[in-house]
Structure formats: C-alpha cells, structure tokens
Amino acid sequence: MNSLKVARVVLRAVRPAPALRRGYADVAPDKLRLTLALPHQAMYKSQDVVQVNIPAESGEMGILAQHVPSIEQLKPGLVEIIEEAGGNKQFFLSGGFATVQPGSVLSINAVEGYPLEDFSAENVRNQISEAQKIASGSGSEQDKAEANIELEVLESLQAALK
C-alpha cells in the first residue's frame, strides 16, 4: 500500500474533533421575587419587587436581588416593600419567618399582617394604656404575660405609625 492510501485510511478512521461552542452563564435576576403569605390570603404572590425591608430578630434587614440565602425569624414590626414602579407599601406583621432562596426569591410567612394605613394612632394609644393596666395589675401571671406580649406588639406598631 502506498503512503497516500494509508493516509486516506487513517484520516477516515480518525473522528473529527467536536466543534466547541461558547456558553454563557444565565443572566442574574435584577429583581427580587416576593411572596408574602398569611394563613387566609397571599398579599404578594411571586411578584417582582426592588427591595424588601424586614424587622428580623437579628436586626433590621434590607433584602435586594442576589441576597445571600438565609432564614430569618421576624419580630413584630414594619415590612416595607419597594415596588418596581417606584412606589412602596408598608405592612405591619405580628411576627413570622422570612426565607431568602437562591435565584432572588423571598418568601415571608406571617400569622397576622395588615397594611399600615389600616391602623389609627389614637386606637393604638388607647390599647397600650389598657395593656399597661393589665400588665401592672393584680391579675394572674398568664394575664400579665399576655399583656406584656400585647404591649410589645402595640409599641412596635406605635413606632411604625410615627
């Protein structure tokens, strides 16, 4: 066999190298996808927002897109949601949990939550004085403990209304 025939046979036997194509990483989301759920309703259901400020037990937190994944216990306080259109909404939550998941997903679960504008500063002051009377009164230990918890929530609400 001459060398030309050998070269042809060898070339046919060799598999061509795969064509390499450039791959691109997925685009990182620039919005935060928020779900704010209560037992009886979803106030936000997978809606894109710019930022959410929460009252975590570890301190006040501002959460943006690409936040590190975490789980935070919420204390009673104001949750502020900055929406894409530039407006913001404020809700008072009695407590709960916030979970930041990979992919800029934030889930907030709370037992009670209401828009801040639903509250009257005068009514809150009246309820605080009633709870203080019970907490410092001669009632049972359980009544005093419940009044102290109520005071904590009402004082947080009063601070949010200012």
Language-model regions, residue ranges each:
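N-terminal mitochondrial targeting presequence
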Residues: 1-29
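Short N-terminal helix-initiation segments at or just after the protein's N-terminus
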Residues: 19-24, 41, 157-158
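Compositionally biased, intrinsically disordered low-complexity regions
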Residues: 25, 61-64, 141
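Acidic, gly/proline-rich low-complexity N-terminal segments at the extreme N terminus
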Residues: 25-39
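Compact, glycine-rich, soluble single-domain proteins
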Residues: 35-126, 130
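Acidic/glycine-rich phosphate/pyrophosphate-binding loops and surrounding catalytic core
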Residues: 114-162
